[in-house]
């Protein structure tokens, strides 16, 4: 089973940015953790990151053309306003789980709404990097 993990804006700053919210592990440590756990689950996991909305949309399109079985996406701040990412996810019809390291519902009011989550089979929020592992398990069980 082939899974694409897409990380949006500022996630490359993990370990630097607001450690009390996002944790002390740097981006590469989190990616290594995701890949190791994916391998344990018998998944082929490829990870991508961009601060640019159009590149994120291209990753989603590529997931379709490269025949990925599932997508895990942390759209970062695009969560709250990117209709374009929502449309891309709806357009490819690949089972997708939205992940957030922090609990977006316990943060600033503007972070409470996700416009991208309705295009996903589920949302995992507030479990740190373990949320990606939860998402991989969810996809593995959903896709079978």
Swiss-Prot record:
CDD domains: DHQase_II. The record marks 17 as: Transition state stabilizer. Pathway: Metabolic intermediate biosynthesis; chorismate biosynthesis; chorismate from D-erythrose 4-phosphate and phosphoenolpyruvate: step 3/7. Its EC number is 4.2.1.10. Substrate binds at residues 74, 80, 87, 101-102, 111. Keywords: Amino-acid biosynthesis, Aromatic amino acid biosynthesis, Lyase. InterPro entries: DHquinase_II (IPR001874), DHquinase_II_CS (IPR018509), DHquinase_II_sf (IPR036441). The active site is at residues 22, 100. Pfam families: DHquinase_II. Gene3D superfamilies: Dehydroquinase, class II. Belongs to the type-II 3-dehydroquinase family. This is 3-dehydroquinate dehydratase.
